[in-house]
Swiss-Prot record:
Any GO MF annotation of the entry: heme binding
Stated role: Required during biogenesis of c-type cytochromes (cytochrome c6 and cytochrome f) at the step of heme attachment.
Short name of any one Pfam family annotated for the protein: Cytochrom_C_asm
Protein name: Cytochrome c biogenesis protein CcsA
Subcellular localization, as worded in the UniProt entry: Cellular thylakoid membrane
Top-level taxon in the UniProt lineage: Bacteria
Signal peptide: none
HAMAP family in UniProt: CytC_CcsA (MF_01391)
Amino acid sequence: MDLITLQNFLDNSSFLLLFLTMLIYWAGAAFPNVTWLPTLGTTGVAIANLCMATLLGARWLEAGYFPLSNLYESLFFLAWGVTAIHLVAEQMSRSALVGVVTTPVAMGITAFAALSLPPEMQTSAPLVPALKSNWLMMHVSVMMLSYATLMVGSVLAIAFLVVTRNRDIELKGSSVGTGGYRDKLGRSLLNNNHKQTTVNLTQSNGSGGTAILESVAVKPETVTLSPQRLNLADTLDNISYRIIGLGFPLLTIGIIAGAVWANEAWGSYWSWDPKETWALITWLVFAAYLHARITKGWQGRKPAILAASGFVVVWVCYLGVNLLGKGLHSYGWFF
């Protein structure tokens, strides 16, 4: 089997594995009593990750350069990064819900690369002069890893929003009381007592005694989130924060490396190219997220909404601006 045939086999195998793994994770969420499904899902993601790593290695051997020169190669590198960060996040959280939301992202990326791109884009070609630099590996690989990490962190924030929908809560370690799970008014969400409380309203009868005027049955507010869902929400919020905290410095390093490379290649550190502009917007969005978490003490839905918007911004930065075919970063894509 030559390297080209091996690559064709591995890209289709990666897509098929991730598709089946996505179904396994979804089945595990629908039938939580089937305890072996999450383990099978994790195994599937690990095998898919290995397939994509082998694909990129074969591509490197065939072409003679690090495989990040066009859309096909960068998509598979991105999918490899998403699956790698998925394994880290799943190990940290011990929750199968991570796979429920991350495997569709990885599967969609591989489907786009393996099934949608034209054959000429899936074959390796000589590097354009601008890419013949050692900065290709340094800049592009770090940027792609940052995209993958931020995507996983953002999609976990989206999962948090779904789990806590219609309920504005503050999580453990909040500034309200001594922590615990509380709604935005500070009411504990774990002391969910469905019993009615009878309140006796009394009045003096003028002879030293009391007379009951009325008995009122007070039913506590019904809490929509079970303790299990609240624990899951806390885990998702924490893991999302930590994963984004890992992706942000990678994005920062990637942008700095790109500026140095741009100065060597084009004589300017910053040209306000569409890709550069959206990279800055992406950096600002996640900088605002981390600033709100670290200095303002935001937790729960407000920072999760900001992180969820970052998922869209990352995709616009990575893929959207290149659909225009304009700017210094348009080579190797559609036009």
